[in-house]
């Protein structure tokens, strides 16, 4: 059938078609970036590196926009959770910055990329960062492994992980120009 705005039954039907890869659902099952390209309008895809923009509109939190654009796995709010600082959530309150300003967001995003590469490696929930910081992560790591890493050493491990992922992406064909937000986020008002 035809999709129309507000047609809830059509939404249910197309969801089933996507699951069964039937009709138009076969194209939509590929994700919004591929579907938009297939239908001749790649500019309509709200995606980075083929992954759809999740969770937060980057026009309201500039650091999140940089994080989406530079995430090694495409738009992902879990690779550098800058809202912890942009919204002043502890323990990163000392990093609090204006969410609507660009100033300092590159450095902020890099800190969170490194922190979250560490927390991913420790298999910790990202939301534990609302109550814990790198000192707590380091203490936990040292307690479990019997090692004696400093916060700086563990952050360096996070940086290496992130850079290794970046290198893998380069080998897979990502190049300069892959780290971008869709133009609708950079050229249209929110």
Residue ranges with predicted function:
Residues 2-190:
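Extended C-terminal regions of large enzymes
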